[in-house]
Amino acid sequence: MGAVLTQRPDLYQAVVCEYPLEDMLRFQKFLEGPYWVAEYGSAENDAQFPYLYAYSPYHHVKAGAQYPAVLFITGDGDTRVAPLHARKMAARLQSATASDRPILLLYDTKSGHSGGKPVNKEIDEGVDTLSFLLWQLKVGVN
């Protein structure tokens, strides 16, 4: 979602990014990232760098752009995608956006990337996600 968010922010009213991979130039340096080089490529490879840079969401946040409302979801227990991706992307968007729409970070210090998350945490996250979307899309609930 990060790539479409930075490429065409005008197309969306609200975006939810769950456990996102946002910095395509440094992903391979954290957690499971080295295992994804075969799929994504590596910024350390001169031939692959331009392709990764071209769609790396973090590197295409533009100051003054009208970004939609965004909810990033991550947590300390994520052993796949480093939580730093969501944290730094949220901070960058908060600093750059010219819109009055919220850029929020839902951060759980005890759980992470799906599997192994207690059912009550899954439910809470689902409620938070749907509530955010209903709020930002101005959907009335009777």
What are the residue ranges of the model-derived segments?
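Active-site-proximal cap/loop segments of hydrolase catalytic domains
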Residues: 1-142
